[in-house]
A protein has these predicted regions:
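Short, compact, well-ordered microdomains
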Residues: 78-110
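Acidic-basic catalytic patches of nuclease active cores, encompassing PD-(D/E)XK
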Residues: 1-36
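Conserved catalytic cores of phosphodiester-cleaving nucleases, focusing on short active-site segments
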Residues: 28, 34-72
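A near-ubiquitous, low-amplitude feature marking generic local secondary-structure context
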Residues: 2-5, 48, 52, 78, ...
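A short linear-motif detector with a strong N-terminal bias
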Residues: 15, 25-29, 62-66, 84-85
Length: 110
């Protein structure tokens, strides 16, 4: 993984052991999305999305992220406790509310 991702994780105090970068093409056709999967200190499974698109994140895409996380849960037969998204663009207020209502942690980065 590159240095920028480690800096994002360190800034938000996300510490995952056995972290893996998942192949995004298995779950989505989005080229601006990176998916990381790992286990935290309390043995909970975490899913981290890194979105580097320049366009605004809309509610439709927030629903797609939820579908992708469900696909990952069924593929690995686990229950994801923490879902996080890092995004570099603006986010629609309805998309942010949708994600937060589904227990997502949302962080922007520049």
């Amino acid at each position: 993984m590159n240095q920028k991702i480690w800096e994002l994780f360190e800034a938000r105090k996300i510490l995952l052991k056995d972290i893996k970068a998942l192949n995004t093409s298995e779950f989505s056709t989005k080229k601006t999305l990176d998916i990381f999967w790992g286990v935290d200190n309390k043995s909970f499974y975490n899913l981290v999305f890194l979105r580097t698109a320049k366009s605004r994140l809309l509610r439709k895409e927030a629903l797609e992220l939820e579908e992708i996380s469900k696909k990952i849960e069924t593929k690995f037969q686990t229950s994801l406790r923490k879902k996080t998204i890092f995004y570099s663009s603006e986010i629609c207020s309805k998309a942010l509310k949708e994600l937060q209502d589904n227990n997502w942690r949302c962080y922007d980065f520049v």
